Amino acid sequence: MRRRTNIAKQDNRKPMMNGAIRAREVRLIGAEGEQLGVTPTSEALMQAENLNMDLVLISNQEPPVAKIMDYTKFMFEQKKKQKEAKKKQAVVSVKEVRLSPVIDQNDFDTKLRQAIKFLEKGDKVKVSIRFKGRMITHQDVGRQVMDKFAQATKEVAVVEQRAKMDGRQMFLQLAPIKK
């Protein structure tokens, strides 16, 4: 069985314009933003055509609000606003640094430098220690390593989540200090 598709169906993301507006009357706003009152849709379309512009449905109230404007310019401005809003959103990712409960000092320093680099870039850092075999019985050693790591990064980071066990792993969450 084939599905019927409505060819005349308007894309929901784009506002309805010109002939796609099915209301009998619209509350009309002029090209300069002035209120022109409630007018029949056919008359509003003629006014828009006389100005070589489009009639765009702004709000679907009772009666619907339509504005005479240049549709391509309107869509360009909308896309521009969306891009600006997207730029202003801060993208924070979580980077992971894996340690061992019996980590050597040189390895610890390397992981510390790596974590500081992530924090300075503005990313959060998740520090994890995996306990293998019988090391699970020495969780205090892992907690000491975590505390040492948190202490070493206190100038560039704040502890967002204290060290806690989850199965055979211990986690610590660090967030960059806001400037």
From Swiss-Prot:
Any idea which GO molecular function terms this record carries?
Answer: ribosome binding; translation initiation factor activity
Q: By its UniProt entry, which SUPFAM superfamilies does this protein fall under?
A: Translation initiation factor IF3, C-terminal domain, Translation initiation factor IF3, N-terminal domain
Show the GO cellular component annotation of the record. Answer: cytosol; membrane
Q: Which PANTHER family match?
A: TRANSLATION INITIATION FACTOR IF-3, TRANSLATION INITIATION FACTOR IF-3, MITOCHONDRIAL
Q: What does this protein do?
A: IF-3 binds to the 30S ribosomal subunit and shifts the equilibrium between 70S ribosomes and their 50S and 30S subunits in favor of the free subunits, thus enhancing the availability of 30S subunits on which protein synthesis initiation begins.
NCBIfam families hit by this protein: infC
Return the similarity comment.
Belongs to the IF-3 family.
Q: What is this protein called?
A: Translation initiation factor IF-3
| Organism of derivation | Lactococcus lactis subsp. lactis (strain IL1403) (Streptococcus lactis)
Gene that this polypeptide is encoded by: infC
